């Protein structure tokens, strides 16, 4: 489930402008050589994170998913949940609604309040927010934390769906990591943009035409 076409197109342009999305030849975590690379860690300034949070908020609103709060898995999800909560608070469609957020620590604290959870108590319908889904480990841990607190995972909200089949080349899964998460936990995965939106840019903008064939070939081999 992606955001509206205009939101997705604007986000792809924004990611390119920030150097977060690049074309070339990159060895990615799976070991594959990818013709594009998306590194959300390069959204690392107040302005860029503020704009990013606006895209997350819009994608969540566009999705129509009912939710009560946000959860950011440590570590990358922490600033994403925080900033998106701020963006939602200022969004006209929220009619002044104030959305709580929480996140977890990797290690339990043995002083003060203790425990691994920080922020608002986990309750109601909770949206897990992260940058991408690679293996689904972070989502699994988040779902366990949310359910253990008596709350309900409502959706996973990510920046980019790579639309890529999981597994080694000689045993490719018929599904992507995003599809596996949706099937395993019975919740939607909402993305701001996807590989399909990147392909649309490559097809529509002549300045990126040189990368079109490589990305299309990669999608044909690994895509879902």
From Swiss-Prot:
Pfam families: Pribosyltran. Its EC number is 2.4.2.10. Keywords: Glycosyltransferase, Magnesium, Pyrimidine biosynthesis, Transferase. Orotate binds at residues 37-38, 134, 162. It comes from the Bacteria. The keyword Glycosyltransferase applies. Its cofactor is Mg(2+). CDD domains: PRTases_typeI (cd06223). InterPro entries: OPRT (IPR023031), Or_phspho_trans_dom (IPR004467), PRibTrfase_dom (IPR000836), PRTase-like (IPR029057). GO terms for biological process: 'de novo' pyrimidine nucleobase biosynthetic process; 'de novo' UMP biosynthetic process; pyrimidine ribonucleoside biosynthetic process. SUPFAM superfamilies: PRTase-like (SSF53271). This is Orotate phosphoribosyltransferase.
